[in-house]
């Protein structure tokens, strides 16, 4: 209803101003600004829905001021470009319509009415309401009743008898199991669900709506609210360090806790969270690649579900035979948005909906088959009688190719339990949320029936039942939950540990690199993650007087304030204000001690603008002073005009990437010397080793042969035609996710370049 009202007010404002208000520059600018705000808000809502499937939520508030980079971003580029073009077209059209009768005399009354209607359209829009509520959640001091409802359970389970298998199905919400809406989509796992204790009304709350947040909610009974963006939690060294979570209780009760997934454990800090709360045995993409039968069988995120669940079964069998008490948690990935992935071993590889194949539904149908196969193996084993199996979604599905069909249904998260000791078939329609999952499991295992804000759905009352406005209540508790991190409010001295790549201050530890915004009684950490912009882009968003401490590789900051370090890949510390003074210090000891020293200087806006502009230069446009192309730093020497076919810098150098160009091309500003040596320090990837690699300068071509280790090759060229471009053609680029950013499409690697140098020859 509010959408219709806000649009009606918007339309009325446009029509009244265009046909009645007449000509006045001030009123035109004011009305266009407010109407433009309405457009921006609603396009933001649309874009947020595209990314999150849940409107403008807590994660969106973060990305409004930080670039979205990382997982699967290539699949969102086209919609993003479309939104920008649509926004431009709407603004141009809006301005043209409002000025249709600009030659008519100005009418104050109609101008005022049009402006008031425009303001009303903004106020009535759902986007404005969502943003207002989020902003309020950032500024509240908390809610006094948090201490009443947040309850810590006993740290042990008396006389535990049951092992636990907990399966997180990526985005595998209960809605997919509606056989009337989606016939025969989930027959295998659906049949198992129908034999279980099936909790049919598990709602999603703020701070539980992405994977690491859903894991925290289900194991600790609290939403993931933090003094930084949730997916950046890979940079912290401990995770809610004061809280008692399910893994802590299991470990204290004699359980060995295991976690198995196909993706990299570092993504979003899952490794930090699990290690902080009782898990000593973790297996992700790096740990599994030396164990699985086919290490090359991977999708954009890591190993396919069939591989992961096979390894989980092996671990279950091994642990069960040992007789020790254990918990085994596993997380699937094949149903990840926007499209999902199809394991090669499942029978259900295709699902048609609306008369055509739907990739997301196909991925769901395949993944549920793999999960069902894993569960049936456990059920058929002699150890099932001592086992509790839990199957849950980590969160509701985000915007995938099935999302518009899901939204037509009553959406809930998946949570069902199979007890080998006491088989029970029942559908429980009690109102609950993800935070109740851990408390319910704890209750079944013989522990307390509460965990944080979670309550057992078998013997307690969920917050979702107590509070009709539970979503608003959860946001009201946000400051209280953030305080559970015990995060420091000041930084005076700090220590950088080069062996561990960490910074420590005021009792907290963070992984490097790190950016800190420092103000009175607040230190805001801005880590670098797959979902956030590089730190220099985040720093560029700081105000001129904001105090900062930035710890990163020297070359990233040296261009601005310490050119002598512009080729150094060591750690450096920069601090100051973008509009004031800055200083850069080289970290030259294994344990380096530093102190903050912010000066209250006069702000220079020209300096501020220059710093911001320099920080925002994209990597390929950066230029440095050097007599060779050094590939382990961003950019290129000043003599290079442009280059292509080259991937991002890594600690050793850069790979060629045929996804960016079949050839490596380096074009210089001036013609290369008439006679010169081309000194190439490089290595080959995979089968490119020992094969001739063509290197061309103009019409002259030579070949070099590289191995899998770094070597230096010198080629002698004559350049009579004054060519200015070096071309290297990797013979057999190989698609791989090795060393890739999690969630990105595979790169096609050929040669790895460390340095290329042009040395002029006499004669």
From Swiss-Prot:
* Reaction(s) catalysed (UniProt annotation): a phosphatidylglycerol + a membrane-derived-oligosaccharide D-glucose = a 1,2-diacyl-sn-glycerol + a membrane-derived-oligosaccharide 6-(glycerophospho)-D-glucose
Question: Where does the source fall among the domains of life?
Answer: Bacteria
Ranked from the top, the taxonomy reads: Bacteria, Pseudomonadati, Pseudomonadota, Gammaproteobacteria, Enterobacterales
Q: What is its EC number?
A: 2.7.8.20
Q: What class of enzyme is it?
A: transferase
Q: Which Cys pairs are S-S linked?
A: none
Q: Per its UniProt record, what InterPro entries does this chain match?
A: Alkaline_phosphatase_core_sf, DUF7024, OpgB, OpgB/LTA_synthase_biosynth, Sulfatase_N
Q: What is this protein called?
A: Phosphoglycerol transferase I
Keywords, A to Z, come to: Cell inner membrane, Cell membrane, Membrane, Transferase, Transmembrane, Transmembrane helix
This chain is encoded by the gene named mdoB
Topology of the protein relative to the lipid bilayer: Multi-pass membrane protein
Q: Which HAMAP family does this one have?
A: MdoB_OpgB
What PANTHER family has UniProt attached to this entry? LIPOTEICHOIC ACID SYNTHASE (PTHR47371), PHOSPHOGLYCEROL TRANSFERASE I (PTHR47371:SF3)
The organism is Escherichia fergusonii (strain ATCC 35469 / DSM 13698 / CCUG 18766 / IAM 14443 / JCM 21226 / LMG 7866 / NBRC 102419 / NCTC 12128 / CDC 0568-73)
Q: Which Pfam families match?
A: DUF7024 (PF22895), Sulfatase (PF00884)
Show the GO cellular component annotation of the record: plasma membrane
């Amino acid at each position: 209803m509010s959408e219709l009202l806000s649009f009606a007010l918007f339309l009325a404002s446009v029509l009244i101003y265009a046909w009645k208000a007449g000509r006045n520059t001030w009123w035109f600018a004011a009305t266009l600004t407010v109407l433009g705000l309405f457009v921006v808000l609603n396009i933001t809502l649309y874009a947020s829905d595209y990314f999150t499937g849940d409107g403008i939520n807590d994660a969106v508030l973060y990305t409004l001021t930080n670039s979205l980079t990382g997982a699967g971003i290539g699949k969102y580029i086209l919609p993003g470009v479309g939104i920008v073009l649509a926004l431009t077209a709407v603004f141009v059209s809006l301005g043209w319509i409002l000025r249709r009768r600009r030659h008519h005399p100005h009418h104050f009354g109609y101008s005022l009415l049009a402006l008031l209607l425009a303001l009303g359209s903004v106020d009535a829009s759902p986007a404005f309401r969502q943003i207002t509520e989020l902003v309020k959640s950032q500024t509240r001091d908390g809610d006094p009743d948090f201490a009443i409802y947040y309850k810590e359970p006993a740290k042990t389970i008396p006389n535990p008898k049951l092992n636990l298998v907990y399966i997180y199905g990526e985005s595998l919400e209960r809605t997919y199991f509606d056989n009337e809406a989606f016939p025969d989509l989930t027959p295998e796992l659906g049949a198992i669900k129908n034999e279980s204790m099936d909790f049919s009304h598990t709602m999603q709350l703020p701070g539980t709506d992405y994977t690491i947040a859903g894991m925290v909610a289900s194991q600790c009974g609290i939403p993931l609210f933090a003094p930084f963006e949730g997916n950046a939690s890979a940079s912290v060294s401990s995770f809610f360090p004061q809280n008692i979570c399910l893994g802590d209780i299991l470990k204290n009760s004699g359980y060995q806790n295991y976690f198995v997934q196909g993706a990299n454990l570092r993504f979003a800090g899952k490794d930090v969270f699990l290690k902080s709360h009782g898990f000593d045995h973790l297996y992700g993409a790096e740990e599994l690649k030396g164990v699985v039968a086919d290490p090359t069988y991977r999708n954009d995120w890591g190993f396919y579900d069939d591989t992961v669940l096979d390894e989980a079964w092996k671990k279950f069998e091994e642990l069960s035979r040992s007789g020790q008490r254990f918990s085994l948690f596993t997380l699937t990935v094949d149903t990840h948005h926007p499209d999902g992935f199809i394991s090669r071993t499942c029978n259900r590889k295709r699902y048609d909906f609306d008369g055509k194949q739907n990739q997301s539904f196909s991925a769901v149908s395949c993944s549920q088959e793999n999960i069902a196969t894993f569960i049936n193996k456990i059920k058929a084993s002699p150890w099932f009688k001592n086992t509790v199996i839990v199957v849950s979604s980590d969160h509701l599905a985000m915007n995938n190719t099935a999302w518009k069909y899901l939204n037509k249904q009553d959406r809930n998260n998946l949570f069902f339990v199979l007890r080998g000791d006491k088989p029970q078939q029942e559908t429980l329609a009690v109102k609950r949320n993800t935070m109740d999952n851990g408390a319910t499991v704890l209750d079944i295992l013989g522990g307390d029936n509460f965990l944080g804000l979670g309550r057992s759905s078998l013997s307690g009352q969920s917050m979702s039942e107590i509070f009709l406005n539970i979503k608003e209540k959860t946001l009201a508790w946000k400051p209280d939950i953030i305080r559970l991190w015990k995060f420091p409010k000041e930084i005076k001295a700090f220590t950088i540990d080069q062996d561990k790549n960490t910074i420590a201050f005021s009792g907290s530890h963070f992984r490097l690199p790190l950016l800190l915004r420092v103000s009175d009684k607040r230190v805001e950490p801005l880590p670098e993650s797959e979902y956030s912009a590089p730190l220099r882009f985040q720093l560029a968003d700081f105000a001129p007087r904001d105090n900062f401490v930035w710890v990163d590789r020297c070359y990233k900051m040296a261009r601005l304030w310490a050119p002598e370090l512009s080729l150094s890949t060591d750690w450096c510390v920069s601090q100051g204000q973008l509009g004031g003074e800055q200083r850069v210090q080289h970290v030259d000891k294994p344990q380096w001690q530093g102190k903050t020293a912010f000066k209250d200087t006069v702000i220079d806006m020209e300096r501020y603008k220059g710093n911001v502009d320099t920080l925002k230069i994209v990597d390929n446009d950066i230029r440095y002073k050097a007599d060779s192309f050094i590939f382990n730093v961003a950019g290129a020497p000043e003599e290079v005009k442009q280059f292509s076919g080259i991937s991002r810098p890594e600690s050793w150098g850069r790979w060629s990437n045929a996804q960016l160009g079949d050839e490596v091309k380096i074009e210089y500003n001036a013609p290369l010397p008439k006679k010169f040596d081309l000194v190439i320090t490089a290595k080959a990837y995979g089968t490119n080793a020992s094969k001739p690699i063509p290197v061309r300068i103009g019409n002259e071509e030579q070949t070099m042969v590289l191995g899998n280790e770094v070597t230096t090759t010198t080629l002698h060229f004559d350049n009579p035609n004054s060519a200015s471009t070096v071309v290297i053609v990797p013979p057999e680029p190989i698609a791989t996710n090795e060393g890739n950013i999690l969630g990105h499409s595979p790169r096609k690697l050929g040669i790895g370049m460390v340095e290329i140098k042009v040395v002029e020859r006499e004669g």
